[in-house]
Amino acid sequence: MAEKNKKEHPVTKDRLHPRNKHRERYDFDALIATTPELAQYVTLNIYNDQSIDFFNPAAVLCLNQALLKHYYGIDEWNIPEGYLCPPIPGRADYIHNIAALLGTSANDVIPVGPAIKCLDIGVGANCVYPIIGNNEYGWSFVGADVDPVSVASAKNIVDKNKVLQGNVEIRLQNHPLDIFYGIIGEGERFDVTICNPPFHASAEDAAAGTLRKLSNLQHKKVTKANLNFGGQHNELWCEGGESAFVREMILESKKFAASCLWFSTLISKQTNLQKAYDQLEVLAPFDVRTIPMGQGNKSSRLIAWTFQSKEAQAKWVSARWK
Protein backbone atom coordinates (compact mmCIF):
# COMPACT_ATOMS: atom_id res chain seq x y z
CA MET A 1 0.00 0.00 0.00
CA ALA A 2 2.86 2.35 0.81
CA GLU A 3 4.14 2.06 -2.74
CA LYS A 4 0.86 3.39 -4.11
CA ASN A 5 1.29 6.47 -1.96
CA LYS A 6 4.92 6.87 -2.94
CA LYS A 7 5.28 10.25 -4.59
CA GLU A 8 7.40 10.42 -7.73
CA HIS A 9 10.17 12.95 -7.32
CA PRO A 10 12.52 14.26 -10.00
CA VAL A 11 16.03 12.85 -9.72
CA THR A 12 17.48 16.35 -9.63
CA LYS A 13 16.23 19.84 -8.85
CA ASP A 14 16.77 21.17 -12.35
CA ARG A 15 16.22 24.80 -11.39
CA LEU A 16 19.35 24.78 -9.27
CA HIS A 17 22.77 25.51 -10.78
CA PRO A 18 24.55 22.46 -12.28
CA ARG A 19 27.41 22.83 -9.78
CA ASN A 20 25.07 23.04 -6.79
CA LYS A 21 25.70 20.12 -4.41
CA HIS A 22 22.03 20.14 -3.41
CA ARG A 23 20.41 19.33 -6.74
CA GLU A 24 19.47 15.88 -5.50
CA ARG A 25 17.10 15.19 -2.62
CA TYR A 26 18.59 15.31 0.84
CA ASP A 27 20.47 12.11 1.71
CA PHE A 28 19.32 11.93 5.31
CA ASP A 29 21.27 8.74 6.04
CA ALA A 30 24.52 10.47 5.05
CA LEU A 31 23.57 13.62 6.94
CA ILE A 32 22.74 11.64 10.09
CA ALA A 33 26.08 9.86 9.82
CA THR A 34 27.72 13.30 9.85
CA THR A 35 25.41 14.81 12.48
CA PRO A 36 23.72 12.10 14.59
CA GLU A 37 21.56 14.70 16.37
CA LEU A 38 19.55 15.07 13.16
CA ALA A 39 18.09 11.57 13.55
CA GLN A 40 15.57 12.69 16.18
CA TYR A 41 13.94 15.04 13.66
CA VAL A 42 13.79 12.72 10.64
CA THR A 43 10.55 10.84 10.01
CA LEU A 44 8.76 9.24 7.09
CA ASN A 45 6.14 11.49 5.56
CA ILE A 46 2.88 10.38 3.95
CA TYR A 47 4.76 9.57 0.75
CA ASN A 48 7.14 7.25 2.65
CA ASP A 49 10.04 9.66 2.10
CA GLN A 50 12.48 10.72 4.80
CA SER A 51 11.95 14.34 5.76
CA ILE A 52 11.85 16.76 8.67
CA ASP A 53 9.17 19.10 9.94
CA PHE A 54 10.20 22.36 8.29
CA PHE A 55 7.82 24.14 10.68
CA ASN A 56 10.08 23.13 13.57
CA PRO A 57 12.93 25.66 13.97
CA ALA A 58 15.08 23.18 15.92
CA ALA A 59 14.78 20.64 13.10
CA VAL A 60 15.65 23.22 10.43
CA LEU A 61 18.62 24.43 12.47
CA CYS A 62 19.92 20.88 12.88
CA LEU A 63 19.45 20.17 9.17
CA ASN A 64 21.53 23.23 8.32
CA GLN A 65 24.22 22.16 10.77
CA ALA A 66 24.34 18.76 9.09
CA LEU A 67 24.45 20.21 5.57
CA LEU A 68 27.19 22.68 6.43
CA LYS A 69 29.27 20.00 8.13
CA HIS A 70 28.74 17.31 5.50
CA TYR A 71 29.26 19.44 2.40
CA TYR A 72 31.31 22.43 3.56
CA GLY A 73 33.46 21.17 6.44
CA ILE A 74 31.92 23.43 9.09
CA ASP A 75 32.15 21.72 12.47
CA GLU A 76 30.63 24.48 14.61
CA TRP A 77 27.65 26.47 13.37
CA ASN A 78 24.83 28.07 15.31
CA ILE A 79 22.76 31.23 15.27
CA PRO A 80 21.11 33.26 18.04
CA GLU A 81 17.48 32.52 18.79
CA GLY A 82 15.13 34.41 16.52
CA TYR A 83 17.61 34.93 13.68
CA LEU A 84 17.21 33.81 10.08
CA CYS A 85 18.02 30.16 9.38
CA PRO A 86 18.57 30.25 5.61
CA PRO A 87 17.91 27.49 3.06
CA ILE A 88 21.37 26.27 2.08
CA PRO A 89 20.57 25.16 -1.52
CA GLY A 90 19.36 28.63 -2.51
CA ARG A 91 22.34 30.34 -0.92
CA ALA A 92 24.69 27.99 -2.77
CA ASP A 93 22.97 28.83 -6.05
CA TYR A 94 23.79 32.53 -5.70
CA ILE A 95 27.47 31.71 -5.16
CA HIS A 96 27.66 29.39 -8.18
CA ASN A 97 25.95 31.93 -10.42
CA ILE A 98 28.34 34.62 -9.24
CA ALA A 99 31.29 32.34 -10.01
CA ALA A 100 30.01 31.98 -13.57
CA LEU A 101 29.56 35.76 -13.77
CA LEU A 102 33.16 36.36 -12.72
CA GLY A 103 34.23 33.87 -15.34
CA THR A 104 32.76 36.07 -18.07
CA SER A 105 35.47 38.60 -17.28
CA ALA A 106 38.18 35.97 -17.85
CA ASN A 107 37.25 34.06 -21.00
CA ASP A 108 34.80 31.90 -19.02
CA VAL A 109 37.50 30.62 -16.67
CA ILE A 110 36.08 30.70 -13.15
CA PRO A 111 38.57 32.32 -10.76
CA VAL A 112 39.50 30.41 -7.62
CA GLY A 113 41.69 31.01 -4.61
CA PRO A 114 42.04 33.61 -1.87
CA ALA A 115 43.10 36.39 -4.24
CA ILE A 116 39.43 36.63 -5.23
CA LYS A 117 37.74 38.91 -2.74
CA CYS A 118 33.97 39.03 -2.24
CA LEU A 119 32.00 41.53 -0.16
CA ASP A 120 28.80 40.16 1.39
CA ILE A 121 26.44 43.00 2.29
CA GLY A 122 24.19 41.79 5.11
CA VAL A 123 26.19 38.71 6.04
CA GLY A 124 23.75 37.97 8.85
CA ALA A 125 24.25 35.89 11.96
CA ASN A 126 24.55 32.76 9.82
CA CYS A 127 27.59 33.70 7.65
CA VAL A 128 26.41 31.21 5.04
CA TYR A 129 27.51 32.93 1.82
CA PRO A 130 31.16 33.20 2.94
CA ILE A 131 31.10 29.58 4.14
CA ILE A 132 29.92 28.30 0.76
CA GLY A 133 32.03 30.63 -1.37
CA ASN A 134 35.21 29.88 0.53
CA ASN A 135 34.64 26.12 0.43
CA GLU A 136 33.61 25.90 -3.21
CA TYR A 137 36.04 28.35 -4.77
CA GLY A 138 38.58 29.27 -2.10
CA TRP A 139 37.60 32.96 -2.23
CA SER A 140 38.23 35.32 0.65
CA PHE A 141 35.29 37.26 2.06
CA VAL A 142 34.39 40.37 3.95
CA GLY A 143 30.95 40.13 5.52
CA ALA A 144 29.25 43.34 6.64
CA ASP A 145 26.16 43.86 8.76
CA VAL A 146 24.41 46.66 10.65
CA ASP A 147 23.37 44.40 13.54
CA PRO A 148 25.95 43.91 16.32
CA VAL A 149 24.40 40.58 17.33
CA SER A 150 24.71 39.28 13.76
CA VAL A 151 28.30 40.50 13.58
CA ALA A 152 29.17 38.79 16.87
CA SER A 153 27.52 35.56 15.73
CA ALA A 154 29.26 35.55 12.34
CA LYS A 155 32.61 36.28 14.01
CA ASN A 156 31.98 33.39 16.40
CA ILE A 157 31.37 31.03 13.46
CA VAL A 158 34.63 32.13 11.86
CA ASP A 159 36.56 31.80 15.12
CA LYS A 160 35.28 28.27 15.75
CA ASN A 161 36.11 26.90 12.29
CA LYS A 162 39.76 26.80 11.23
CA VAL A 163 38.80 26.54 7.56
CA LEU A 164 37.35 30.06 7.76
CA GLN A 165 40.07 31.71 9.82
CA GLY A 166 42.13 34.08 7.73
CA ASN A 167 39.65 33.72 4.86
CA VAL A 168 36.58 35.50 6.23
CA GLU A 169 36.51 38.90 7.93
CA ILE A 170 33.37 40.33 9.55
CA ARG A 171 32.78 44.09 9.80
CA LEU A 172 30.12 46.13 11.56
CA GLN A 173 28.39 48.80 9.50
CA ASN A 174 28.08 51.66 11.98
CA HIS A 175 25.81 53.73 9.74
CA PRO A 176 22.63 51.73 8.97
CA LEU A 177 21.62 53.93 6.04
CA ASP A 178 24.90 53.27 4.21
CA ILE A 179 25.75 50.24 2.09
CA PHE A 180 29.35 50.52 0.89
CA TYR A 181 30.39 53.70 2.71
CA GLY A 182 32.14 52.79 5.94
CA ILE A 183 32.85 49.24 4.74
CA ILE A 184 35.02 49.53 1.62
CA GLY A 185 38.29 51.09 2.72
CA GLU A 186 40.38 53.54 0.74
CA GLY A 187 42.32 51.65 -1.90
CA GLU A 188 40.51 48.39 -1.11
CA ARG A 189 39.40 46.25 -4.05
CA PHE A 190 36.64 43.66 -4.32
CA ASP A 191 36.07 41.39 -7.28
CA VAL A 192 32.36 41.11 -6.56
CA THR A 193 29.76 42.26 -4.06
CA ILE A 194 26.75 40.12 -3.15
CA CYS A 195 23.58 40.89 -1.23
CA ASN A 196 20.28 39.34 -0.21
CA PRO A 197 18.44 42.57 0.63
CA PRO A 198 15.65 43.02 3.18
CA PHE A 199 12.41 42.24 1.38
CA HIS A 200 9.71 44.03 3.37
CA ALA A 201 9.05 47.73 3.91
CA SER A 202 7.83 47.51 7.52
CA ALA A 203 7.68 45.24 10.55
CA GLU A 204 3.99 44.64 9.86
CA ASP A 205 4.69 43.52 6.30
CA ALA A 206 7.46 41.23 7.53
CA ALA A 207 5.22 39.63 10.15
CA ALA A 208 2.45 39.09 7.61
CA GLY A 209 4.95 37.56 5.18
CA THR A 210 6.21 35.14 7.81
CA LEU A 211 2.65 34.05 8.59
CA ARG A 212 1.99 33.46 4.88
CA LYS A 213 5.14 31.35 4.63
CA LEU A 214 4.16 29.29 7.66
CA SER A 215 0.61 28.88 6.37
CA ASN A 216 1.93 27.56 3.07
CA LEU A 217 4.16 25.08 4.88
CA GLN A 218 1.33 23.88 7.10
CA HIS A 219 -1.32 24.01 4.38
CA LYS A 220 -3.55 25.83 6.83
CA LYS A 221 -3.92 29.34 8.17
CA VAL A 222 -1.40 30.29 10.85
CA THR A 223 -2.11 33.27 13.09
CA LYS A 224 1.03 33.34 15.24
CA ALA A 225 4.60 32.82 14.12
CA ASN A 226 7.27 31.02 16.08
CA LEU A 227 9.94 33.59 16.93
CA ASN A 228 12.67 31.23 15.76
CA PHE A 229 11.34 31.03 12.25
CA GLY A 230 11.23 34.42 10.61
CA GLY A 231 14.38 36.42 11.28
CA GLN A 232 15.19 39.77 12.88
CA HIS A 233 13.92 43.11 11.62
CA ASN A 234 17.15 44.09 9.86
CA GLU A 235 17.16 40.72 8.06
CA LEU A 236 13.58 41.01 6.84
CA TRP A 237 12.68 44.67 6.43
CA CYS A 238 13.99 48.19 6.04
CA GLU A 239 12.37 51.53 5.37
CA GLY A 240 11.12 51.39 1.78
CA GLY A 241 11.73 47.65 1.48
CA GLU A 242 13.77 45.87 -1.15
CA SER A 243 13.29 48.60 -3.74
CA ALA A 244 14.70 51.37 -1.54
CA PHE A 245 17.61 49.23 -0.36
CA VAL A 246 18.63 48.30 -3.89
CA ARG A 247 18.22 51.90 -5.04
CA GLU A 248 20.70 53.07 -2.38
CA MET A 249 23.08 50.27 -3.29
CA ILE A 250 23.03 51.24 -6.96
CA LEU A 251 23.60 54.91 -6.11
CA GLU A 252 26.57 54.12 -3.88
CA SER A 253 28.02 51.68 -6.39
CA LYS A 254 28.78 54.55 -8.75
CA LYS A 255 30.99 56.12 -6.08
CA PHE A 256 32.87 52.83 -5.74
CA ALA A 257 32.99 52.04 -9.46
CA ALA A 258 36.78 51.66 -9.40
CA SER A 259 36.77 49.62 -6.18
CA CYS A 260 34.67 46.69 -7.39
CA LEU A 261 34.71 44.70 -10.60
CA TRP A 262 31.10 43.49 -10.32
CA PHE A 263 28.25 44.54 -8.08
CA SER A 264 25.29 42.23 -7.57
CA THR A 265 22.11 41.75 -5.58
CA LEU A 266 19.18 39.40 -5.43
CA ILE A 267 15.82 40.82 -6.49
CA SER A 268 12.96 38.83 -5.00
CA LYS A 269 10.10 41.00 -6.17
CA GLN A 270 9.58 41.01 -9.93
CA THR A 271 8.13 44.53 -9.87
CA ASN A 272 11.37 45.87 -8.39
CA LEU A 273 13.42 44.68 -11.34
CA GLN A 274 12.38 47.46 -13.70
CA LYS A 275 13.00 50.04 -10.98
CA ALA A 276 16.55 48.77 -10.68
CA TYR A 277 17.01 48.86 -14.46
CA ASP A 278 15.76 52.45 -14.59
CA GLN A 279 18.16 53.50 -11.85
CA LEU A 280 21.09 51.75 -13.51
CA GLU A 281 20.30 53.39 -16.83
CA VAL A 282 20.78 56.79 -15.23
CA LEU A 283 24.21 55.80 -13.88
CA ALA A 284 25.23 54.15 -17.17
CA PRO A 285 27.30 51.12 -16.14
CA PHE A 286 29.25 49.36 -18.89
CA ASP A 287 27.28 46.11 -18.52
CA VAL A 288 24.17 44.89 -16.70
CA ARG A 289 23.28 41.21 -16.35
CA THR A 290 20.11 39.50 -15.14
CA ILE A 291 20.44 35.90 -14.01
CA PRO A 292 17.24 33.94 -13.28
CA MET A 293 17.26 31.72 -10.22
CA GLY A 294 14.74 29.41 -8.62
CA GLN A 295 14.22 26.74 -6.00
CA GLY A 296 11.06 24.67 -5.84
CA ASN A 297 8.11 26.91 -6.64
CA LYS A 298 9.98 30.10 -5.75
CA SER A 299 11.48 32.21 -8.52
CA SER A 300 13.92 35.06 -8.08
CA ARG A 301 16.75 36.62 -9.99
CA LEU A 302 20.00 38.39 -9.39
CA ILE A 303 21.16 41.46 -11.21
CA ALA A 304 24.80 42.35 -11.64
CA TRP A 305 26.48 45.41 -13.08
CA THR A 306 29.97 46.70 -13.72
CA PHE A 307 31.36 50.10 -14.60
CA GLN A 308 34.51 48.52 -16.03
CA SER A 309 34.94 48.30 -19.80
CA LYS A 310 36.13 45.05 -21.38
CA GLU A 311 39.63 46.47 -21.52
CA ALA A 312 39.47 47.52 -17.88
CA GLN A 313 38.14 44.09 -16.91
CA ALA A 314 41.06 42.42 -18.69
CA LYS A 315 43.53 44.65 -16.84
CA TRP A 316 41.77 43.93 -13.54
CA VAL A 317 41.95 40.18 -14.12
CA SER A 318 45.59 40.32 -15.20
CA ALA A 319 46.59 42.34 -12.15
CA ARG A 320 44.60 40.52 -9.46
CA TRP A 321 43.66 36.99 -10.50
CA LYS A 322 46.97 35.20 -10.18
Swiss-Prot record:
Alphabetical list of InterPro entries matching this protein = METTL16/RlmF (IPR010286), rRNA_lsu_MeTfrase_F (IPR016909), SAM-dependent_MTases_sf (IPR029063)
Reactions it catalyzes: adenosine(1618) in 23S rRNA + S-adenosyl-L-methionine = N(6)-methyladenosine(1618) in 23S rRNA + S-adenosyl-L-homocysteine + H(+)
- Which Pfam families does this UniProt record tie to the protein? Methyltransf_10 (PF05971)
- At the top of the EC hierarchy, this enzyme's class is transferase
Q: Which SUPFAM superfamilies does the UniProt record give? A: S-adenosyl-L-methionine-dependent methyltransferases (SSF53335)
Query: What is the recorded function of this protein according to its Swiss-Prot or TrEMBL entry?
Result: Specifically methylates the adenine in position 1618 of 23S rRNA.
Family per similarity comment: Belongs to the methyltransferase superfamily. METTL16/RlmF family.
Molecular function via GO: 23S rRNA (adenine(1618)-N(6))-methyltransferase activity
- Keyword annotations for this protein? Cytoplasm, Methyltransferase, rRNA processing, S-adenosyl-L-methionine, Transferase
Q: Which chain positions lie within coiled-coil regions? A: none
Name of the featured protein: Ribosomal RNA large subunit methyltransferase F
Q: What is the annotated localization of this protein?
A: Cytoplasm
The record, for Gene3D superfamilies, names: Vaccinia Virus protein VP39 (3.40.50.150)
Please give the GO cellular component terms listed in this UniProt entry: cytoplasm
> What biological-process terms (Gene Ontology) are attached?
rRNA base methylation
What domain of life is recorded for the organism?
Bacteria
Enzyme Commission number(s) = 2.1.1.181
